[in-house]
Amino acid sequence: VDTCVKMADLILPEGVVVSMKDKDGNVTEEKIDDEYYDVPMAVLVNGYSASASEILAGAIRDNHAGLLVGTKTFGKGIVQSSLEFADGSGMKVTTARYYTPSGECIHEIGIEPDVEVELDEDAVTRYGINNLPHDHDAQLQKAIELLGGTPVLTTATPDEADAAEEK
């Protein structure tokens, strides 16, 4: 959460990034100051977006600081603490829930994008989610379009770039 709040401090106006409410109703808020980069923003989200990335996505949405593009997020909005016992065993205990600046609990619900765009499952299967070429990533292309930019071309390796220059 600390890294999420630091990132939010760079791109969001002053206010609450996330609040946490424990079982007794005690609320803790993470706030940021008013110095930030006010730039157009489109943030890609999907079912793999969970926890801190959902907190940041919710703060961006609630502050009207950018558009969320993709599919619904995972929905992990709980704070867990690890307990270790003398015998070496341990367990995780849920101690609180995360809430977006507007007060929305995202646990087991997720966050809906502003613009829904599915990924091409054939491309994901072929390349893998982390190696999807830019020109096969419909979510990225839609985000670029929404920002008024030029579509991103597939990145060439240094050898491919050198070969293209020689032609």
What is each stretch, according to the model?
Residues 1-51, 78-84:
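Gly/Ser/Thr-rich loop/hinge elements
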Residues 9-16, 49-50, 61-65, 144-152:
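Sec-exported extracytoplasmic/periplasmic mature domains
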Residues 11, 41-44, 60, 103, ...:
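Terminal peptide-recognition signature
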Residues 20, 117-167:
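C-terminal recognition in membrane/secretory proteostasis and scaffolding
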Residues 63-76:
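Short, well-structured beta-strand/strand-turn elements
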Residues 80-84, 91-125:
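Conserved P-loop NTPase
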